[in-house]
UniProtKB/Swiss-Prot annotation:
Transfers and isomerizes the ribose moiety from AdoMet to the 7-aminomethyl group of 7-deazaguanine (preQ1-tRNA) to give epoxyqueuosine (oQ-tRNA). GO terms for cellular component: cytoplasm. It catalyses: 7-aminomethyl-7-carbaguanosine(34) in tRNA + S-adenosyl-L-methionine = epoxyqueuosine(34) in tRNA + adenine + L-methionine + 2 H(+). This is S-adenosylmethionine:tRNA ribosyltransferase-isomerase. It comes from the Bacteria. It comes from Jannaschia sp. (strain CCS1). HAMAP family: QueA.
Amino acid sequence: MKLDDFDFDLPDGLIATRPARPRSSARLLVADGPETHDLTVADLPSMLRRGDRLVLNDTRVIPARLTGTRTRMSAQGEVTARIEVTLMEPQADGTWSALAKPMRKLKAGEKIIFSNALQADVHAMDEGLRLAFNVEGDDFDAALNAAGAMPLPPYIAGKRAPDARDYHDYQTIWAKRAGAVAAPTASLHFDEHLMDALTSRGVDVTFVTLHVGAGTFLPVTVDDVTTHKMHAEWGEVRATAAAEINATKAAGGRIIPVGTTALRLIESAAQDGTIHPFEGTTDIFIYPGYRWQITDALMTNFHLPKSTLLMLVSALMGKDRMDAVYAHAIANQYRFFSYGDASLLFPSQKGQTSR
């Protein structure tokens, strides 16, 4: 299975840099087995049945992009450098793994000043940058919220800088557990009106947590995709969530994760149609040939060429079907990636229909 098999040409103008307003007015491409329907996210309830269960990721994106200064003494006196930092994930010893630009201007033991309230010591660099901050807990959260910016994906950040609108736009309406440095973007389409409509339809929801890491944007660099090593992310399926999902399966309802993050987590926690409580890291890599455990359908945005997420949806729907879905999306001017439109995928090989 070759990486080039998952390539496609995407016009640059189809990369969304702002979300639809209102959220649920985004377009929704429904691939129901061999059938294709062009709808909007507001139509989602009509495509679901009473007793279906949506699985939602309640992670909260932290403002992980920081700009600070590093000062050191030289023969010419005090020298200051501007440093841009993106936090990756917290470590067991209290430090944060991070990326920095320019990395060459940092040495272990130096200090980066981000604001009067927030600074960090360069703790280590031999196996990647580690930062030790001067505050923790609620004080760290407050200082980070004041000094940080939302960590927009590179395909958006390359076109514009993050601004105040992104603090709202790049966060789900139910975001609760802080720790992600990227949003579960399919969930960005949900607003209160849509949630009310789903409740009226008799569609159930369950919340799980997967803290999306910056590794989600890393490219696949191997030609044989089956040899790719996925990044690890921390997630939790609580006992109540597992019980809700199992009850839906037992009653004949469908389990429909919203977003690939929720899907990867529940597949990690499931075996032979039953999901179990789970807490820890997962590096599950889903590509064509994968044996599905718990997922019946998926709502997700449109993904990058050659990405692991495109491989995931190809595993669910079949590669030829996904090639046709993406060709339809491009021909009909759907907007792609994090702030773009959505798809609702019902695989025909499982004998499912949308109603």
